[in-house]
Design a protein with these regions (language model features):
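Conserved small/polar residues in nucleotide/adenosyl-binding loops
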Residues: 1-6, 360-367
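Short, Lys/Arg-enriched charge-dense amphipathic segments
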Residues: 19-25, 82-83, 165-172, 181-185, ...
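Feature captures outer-membrane beta-barrel proteins of Gram-negative bacteria and organelles
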Residues: 129-136, 227-231, 262, 271-281, ...
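Structural preference for beta-rich elements and adjacent junctions enriched in aromatics
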Residues: 2, 7-278, 288-289
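Short acidic-hydrophobic sequence patches enriched in Asp/Glu that either
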Residues: 168, 302, 337
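Aromatic- and carboxylate-enriched substrate-binding clefts and catalytic-loop regions
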Residues: 334
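Transmembrane beta-strand segments that form the barrel wall of outer-membrane beta-barrel proteins
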Residues: 107-119, 124-129, 239-247, 285-296, ...
């Protein structure tokens, strides 16, 4: 979707009712006002769109205009604000002929360098290089690959003092993990900031003795490569597959008794995997299965989490029921399992609404680990 005013414009990707403003395409537009009214012209290349290779195309589309001073929004195809999926109420444009989807293939190589001064005022320089690849497998599925990525220019997190027993989850700012990830986050169990960032102390704390401390905690873990395939087929089945590999990272440990130092591995070679199957159903309903897994080399623990989430609406979309089930396991010397499940229901349309009324059951691991 795109929005424009006289001097500004933006584009976003819509997933259900969520607008992802980090979505960025190449397109052009022009806005004008004359005695006949307000006009907007858009020029969007076919490479920015996904459509099948058929002789006659039928597309969904909608147009809207917002008038802020009246708090008014007018749409070409009427939209019911009580329904959750804006896209399902798009208008139809039929009979588009003689267009061919272009090859969707992009290579984006990069080189970067960093210069810093050490404690002895010595100039230290580092160089990095890698590549991003995007390939349209077909009109439904897209492959994204990043090789030796450099996220040094990504916005830093704000400093937060955490005095609670729970971890603070920060927003994801790395472009590879924000584009086309709607399916991966739908079940709420995939937290991409685990990949390629500072290692949790619970991963390496059993290697440090009481009279020792880390000399330095690296702020990130080298990400060797990551890839994802995502899209939705004609039958409404959404597919998402993700894989990421991070390198081994070591640091020094200081012995507070004799001032000696030794080297330990704080982050082993790790492989992260995510699989998502998301099926659209009638009445704006859906069912989603997600599985996340991390494998770590050596004696470090591995983990697996699976989730099933479904939402069922009545034909009128007045009433709904949600259900989700999550099962997790931590594998080291022995397997520890945990699970949670819950449901909620309510009336979401009409002059009288209620809910959601919910219930949640949780059984945690005997040994809690990140």
């Amino acid at each position: 979707g795109s929005e424009m005013c006289i001097r500004d414009r933006l584009d976003a990707k819509i997933f259900n009712q969520d607008f992802n403003n980090l979505f960025n395409l190449v397109w052009n537009s022009k806005v004008s006002i004359n005695e006949k009214g307000w006009f907007a012209e858009l020029k969007i290349p076919y490479s920015a769109l996904r459509f099948p290779k058929t002789k006659i195309q039928n597309w969904n589309i909608n147009f809207a205009r917002q008038i802020s001073r009246f708090r008014e929004e007018s749409t070409w195809q009427p939209v019911n604000p009580d329904l959750e999926n804006y896209l399902l109420e798009s208008g139809k444009v039929n009979g588009i002929e003689n267009i061919t989807p272009p090859l969707r293939l992009a290579f984006i190589p990069f080189l970067s360098s960093y210069y810093s001064f050490s404690k002895n005022d010595d100039l230290v320089s580092t160089y990095n290089g890698g590549m991003d690849i995007k390939y349209g497998i077909n009109e439904a599925l897209t492959l994204d690959v990043t090789l030796l990525p450099d996220f040094g220019q990504v916005v830093f997190d704000k400093q937060v003092l955490n005095i609670s027993p729970f971890e603070i989850q920060f927003n994801e700012n790395r472009q590879f993990f924000t584009e086309g990830t709607e399916l991966f986050t739908k079940s709420g169990i995939f937290y991409s900031r685990r990949i390629g960032v500072q290692t949790s102390p619970k991963v390496y704390q059993n290697q440090i003795q009481e009279n020792e401390e880390l000399v330095e905690i690296p702020s990130s873990v080298p990400l060797l490569n990551a890839s994802k395939i995502s899209g939705r087929l004609k039958n409404g089945l959404g597919i998402g597959v993700f894989n990421g590999i991070t390198a081994e990272q070591q640091t020094e440990v200081l012995n507070l008794t004799d001032s000696s130092e030794r080297t330990i591995t704080i982050s082993p070679l790790s492989n992260y995997n995510v699989l998502v199957l998301d099926q659209n159903l009638k009445n704006n309903s859906f069912v989603t299965f997600t599985n996340t897994n991390v494998w770590r080399a050596g004696l470090f623990y591995d983990a697996n989490v699976s989730a099933i989430k479904t939402k069922l609406n009545t034909p009128s979309n007045d009433y709904f029921i949600d259900f989700d089930l999550k099962v997790s396991s931590i594998i080291n010397s022995e397997a520890n399992f945990g699970h949670s499940w819950g449901f909620e229901t309510g009336k979401q349309r009409g002059n009288f609404t209620f809910g959601p009324v919910s219930y949640t059951h949780l059984r945690a691991h005997e040994t809690t680990l990140d």
